[in-house]
Amino acid sequence: MVDYSKWKNIEISDDEDETHPNIDTPSLFRWRHQARVERMAESEKEKEELKKKRQSYQARLINVKELISKKEGDEVALKKELEKIENEGKELDRQENELLKREKKTPWNVDTISKPGFEKTVINKKPPRKAAEDLTEEEREQRMKQFVKENEKLCKQYGMLRKYDDSKRFLQEHLDLVCEETANYLVIWSINLEMEEKHDLMAHVAHQCICMQYILELAKQLDVDPRACVSSFFSKIQQCVPEYRQQFESEIEGFKERIQKRAQEKLQEAMAQLEEEEKQERMGPGGLDPADVFESLPEELKACFESRDIELLQKTIATMPVDQAKYHMKRCVDSGLWVPNAADVQLGNDETEAKDDETTTATNETPTEKENSKSQNEKSADAAKEEPLYAGVSTDDVD
């Protein structure tokens, strides 16, 4: 059986006490509280006085005992003083015991029923997420390359999943994928698929990319690690209200439009780069594009180059004003459409090869053969002087 008697001496509240109608209840409660406070103050004062007496008693007792031990002064008087002090100590013990008994009998009240164990308030806060590292562009690129090298296969597996439950389970098994690098990889993969005209596959990967971006955005809003938001996101997207679902689908459509636009831009950039490379390959010695130069020529000069008729070219240039002829022929030379003195260059190359052959076989020839060879070479040179080969048209020829 439970003993409730100890609760009878608790004086906590007067709110439920019945009072006479003619008595002002708030005033009565106030007087009672004031009397209680005064009793507590008197008790505290009495304890302080006993504490001071105890300190004085201890000091006097030690002092007298030291004098007796050192045999200083009247020993009889000191012993009487010691006896007197010891009697005072007994009286102090009696008074302290009485005070302790009174305190035990004093009913508890709102001021004495409890006291603070400590005056410190501690509020547990979630540890702040680590701030994004301040990386340079090169460091970010290197970090992305390392991530792709280590996780490309897993990223593609995630990108090919279709059901939300499968995606949730896969990410929970590979929490390292829940990061910004995975979203960036899926964006790049979507662009490449669109450039390859794999539109359906691009749309599927785009859906998975938006899921990852929503997880990262949810983590930012809650200020927690993204890995802690995987389950929350998939539960929310599967049980969401129609408005949230509509917003999610709208985000996917907008993302696919941006992917298509970016893929088209990259294709145009690639085509422009290819054309520029081809143009650089076509560039002549003077840095001009032969196709552009040909299109800028007058029709009569175009006809000469198309027919490859040198005589017609000479006649056409002869009929043109000198400054125009110089201008067009210089552009033809700079673009490589026309190589001046090409025949002389070819002739010089042939003669060099012939001399090399003669040098190689010179040791095997007899003096008669050398003379015959020399005679033939001189005749060939004389013939070349009498009938010069056409070496092409240059700006000097125009003058």
UniProtKB/Swiss-Prot annotation:
Residues 1-11, 367-388 have a biased composition (Basic and acidic residues). GO terms for cellular component: cytoplasm. GO terms for biological process: positive regulation of insulin receptor signaling pathway; positive regulation of neuroblast proliferation; protein folding; protein stabilization. Keywords: Chaperone, Cytoplasm. InterPro entries: Cdc37, Cdc37_C, Cdc37_Hsp90-bd, Cdc37_Hsp90-bd_sf, Cdc37_N_dom. It is found in: Cytoplasm. Residues 1-26, 345-399 are annotated as: Disordered. Its main location: cytoplasm. GO terms for molecular function: heat shock protein binding; insulin receptor binding; protein kinase binding; protein-folding chaperone binding; unfolded protein binding. Pfam families: CDC37_C (PF08564), CDC37_M (PF08565), CDC37_N (PF03234). It comes from the Eukaryota. Co-chaperone that binds to numerous kinases and promotes their interaction with the Hsp90 complex, resulting in stabilization and promotion of their activity. Belongs to the CDC37 family. Forms a complex with Hsp90. Interacts with a number of kinases such as CDC2 and Sevenless. This is Hsp90 co-chaperone Cdc37. The gene is Cdc37.
